[in-house]
Amino acid sequence: MGEFKIQSRFKPTGDQPQAIDKLVNSIKSNNRAQTLLGVTGSGKTFTMANVIEKLQRPTIILAHNKTLAAQLCSEFKEFFPDNIVEYFVSYYDYYQPEAYVPQTDTFIEKDASINDEIDKLRHSATSALFERRDVIIVASVSCIYGLGNPDEYKKLTISLRTGMEKERDEVIKKLIEIQYERNDIDFSRGTFRVRGDSLDIIPASYSNKGIRIEFFGDEIDRIREFDVLTGSILGERNHVAITPASHFATSRETVDKAIGIIEGELEERLRELNAQDKLLEAQRLRQRTNFDIEMIKEMGYCSGIENYSRILDGRASGTPPKTLIDYFPEDFLMFIDESHVTLPQVRAMYAGDRSRKNTLVDYGFRLPCAYDNRPLKFEEFEKKINQVVFVSATPSAYEIDNSEEIAEQIIRPTGLLDPEIIIRPIKGQIDDLYGEINKTIECGFRILITTLTKRMSEDLTKYLIELGVKTTYMHSDIDTIERMKIIRDLRLGEYDVLVGINLLREGLDIPEVALVAILDADKEGFLRSETSLIQTIGRAARNSESKVIMYADNITKSMDKAMKETERRRAIQKDYNERHGIVPTTIIKDVRDIIEATKVAEEVEEYKAADKKKLTKKEKDKLIKDLTEEMLLAAKNLQFERAAELRDIINEIKDGK
């Protein structure tokens, strides 16, 4: 059994050692909740990794979006190359849930595009939890949605060993029961093929390698791993566990029992609808549910089977669904990254799902059991937590009030201080800002400006461009790839100034930025709350020459708290540096990473700019080959937005052939 072991040339420094000790001691003392209050650039991820190494427990890390989850996953893979680090996010590239609009009598069928690579990673994550303890799963908040029952999933897993008495046809029958398909032509993930006494399987958690089971009579003679593409043998196995092809797979006995319960719930609901004189709704419900029942009888599943998950799991009405968290052993550890953003997302998910289901049930599209195919309520989520560490530079009152231990991480390994904050009047703010921009550009640094409205951002960008300042504007309509391209161009000096509204907070760490300007800082509200201000100030904490200018006529409560907190941190950092003889230094990250991240965006733009009809067949083939290699690399690096963009371009080129 593997143990967590960090591989890094760095050792904990600054505030990291005491933060690690505090968190580890608190968790070992069986405290349920603790907070890691770490300033921007203090190495919170490295602290988390050290806590995991010291505690040696299976760990789930929650992030508030797919991009941040992918970034964290990459970092933890670097820290723990010899352990299992998995990625678990929603597998939908596109998802339109089924819905009904009574006003126009419009029913919208469920429509989804499933990303096969992410589905593979989800299966890889759940199967890893049954095989090892040195497992870290980085997940988005979608992990609080219902997943199949882990007990059923484990029960349906096929365990095969060399020397085991097992007939080939018996194994085939079991594979079909757990939703594998026989396909001798298109051999892909979740399928198997038969060749004489050999049975080839590509498990749900694999894609580029398969398992070959060789039989001698009614005995398993040999188990081998092979490369799906080349067919070459990769190694011998004594044992293999084949997990179900779907998390919602269920045994035949469970299905047969569930059908009777579904039929009973249908009859009860039909009586209710008929009593209310809702004859159309009753007819619709009877027709749709009977069709589902027939499909389940014949195939073992149906489209939308998750709406019957409560019955298939044998749960009582209103009880919480099984989720990824239930796949973990009891002593698991949870980190909630950027908890001030992630926890509100968890709170909001149930309400949105419930309002949509109400309409579907009221108008006869679904049985009431569909209500229980849902995300967890916040109280249910809390109950499922064993021990948790909230991670944030600006934890909310919930995290502070519920934590038995708060570990502050104020000192940065680089010795950098929190930026100096200057207050200037609103009158003449643009002229003053223009002067500060010129001073900053002369020193070779960049500027971030945050405004309150889209209109003001656009006008300011236009004004600065007219004055000859290389300025761009980042708004909410810009997709992930374009956003990364803008950041890359800012770092490379294509732009000197970036203007935005609420986009200059979490995750935008640019060492070249030496000035952050906050316009209309005294306008109280969401964009100028204490949390927002501290996060925005943090964008200037990667450069030793940085400062923040707030343009305001009054000092609001939020401003006052943000400034006092920043000054408190700055004083601690300054004192530490003086005592240890540390000179703050700007750590300039290699721009190569950013260039690699935006390479696809450039290739896509070049392709769109070219008239593909003018390309020769040879040129098209080369372009497809290059883009396919880039797409596979992007998927391997968990950069799925880039991979999807490339896939669409490749299809477009092929269609134009």
Swiss-Prot record:
Q: Where is the Helicase ATP-binding domain?
A: 25-182
Q: What are the entry keywords?
A: ATP-binding, Cytoplasm, DNA damage, DNA excision, DNA repair, Excision nuclease, Helicase, Hydrolase, Nucleotide-binding, SOS response
Would you kindly state one Gene Ontology biological process term found in this protein's UniProt entry? SOS response
Per its UniProt record, what InterPro entries does this chain match? Helicase/UvrB_N (IPR006935), Helicase_ATP-bd (IPR014001), Helicase_C-like (IPR001650), P-loop_NTPase (IPR027417), UVR_dom (IPR001943), UVR_dom_sf (IPR036876), UvrB (IPR004807), UvrB_inter (IPR041471)
Location in or out of the cell: Cytoplasm
Task: Just give the chief location class.
Answer: cytoplasm
Motif residue range(s): Beta-hairpin? 91-114
Q: Which Gene3D superfamilies match?
A: P-loop containing nucleotide triphosphate hydrolases, UVR domain
Single GO cellular component term: cytoplasm
Residues noted as binding ATP in the record, renumbered to the chain: G38, V39, T40, G41, S42, G43, K44, T45
Q: Which molecular function GO terms apply here?
A: ATP binding; ATP hydrolysis activity; DNA binding; excinuclease ABC activity; helicase activity
For the keyword Amino-acid biosynthesis, the answer is no
Any idea where the UVR domain is?
621-656
Q: List the disulfide bonds.
A: none
Tell me the HAMAP family matching this sequence: UvrB
* Quaternary assembly: Forms a heterotetramer with UvrA during the search for lesions. Interacts with UvrC in an incision complex.
Relay the domain remarks. The beta-hairpin motif is involved in DNA binding.
The family annotation for this protein states:
Belongs to the UvrB family.
**Protein name per the record:** UvrABC system protein B
Question: What organism does the UniProt record list as the source?
Answer: Clostridium beijerinckii (strain ATCC 51743 / NCIMB 8052)
Taxonomically, what lineage is the organism?
Bacteria, Bacillati, Bacillota, Clostridia, Eubacteriales
Q: Which gene encodes it?
A: uvrB
